[in-house]
């Protein structure tokens, strides 16, 4: 089955689902209206993707206009620098760890969220011999922690489901790069600890969301 953007338990809304399982019911069938803020973030991600896939530097794209969801985003020197800051972190980690670098990797999450075909996207995934790393670019102003971050935990666990079949990783690492804060935050732990955290925090939340949806469906059927 082809992958789909997750709706019932999207990784980006995982914290909201944990705190309020009923939010899945309220958001059911709704499409989020595009915003200039989200469009701008997507444009910065696109510059970073070009750099990592083409082996270029972000400054090469200054002046280009990237259209996302009806909004035009110019690649200014400031945007290019933010993208480059992230790209430099990814390249440095890849050089240090070795292995394979995967850019914008689709990560099936249906095994965890129980939504057929659901998937997320890892901005950058490094598959080393002994370490698996998922790196996430956050282009916003709000500080985001990497430790115990549900979104990154889902991405990392899903990457582990794929690559852990043929690799015996000693550690897994979630990395958040926030250029606006000039910060790089990490969460490093053994694979079994990540699996335990998922089992204790994400699995129960998914079950509560499923229960809420079933309750509404039963009520609507009366």
Question: What does each of the following model-derived ranges do?
Answer:
Residues 1-132, 173, 185:
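Metal-dependent nuclease catalytic cores that hydrolyze phosphodiester bonds in DNA/RNA
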Residues 97-216, 220:
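Mg2+/Mn2+-dependent nuclease catalytic core
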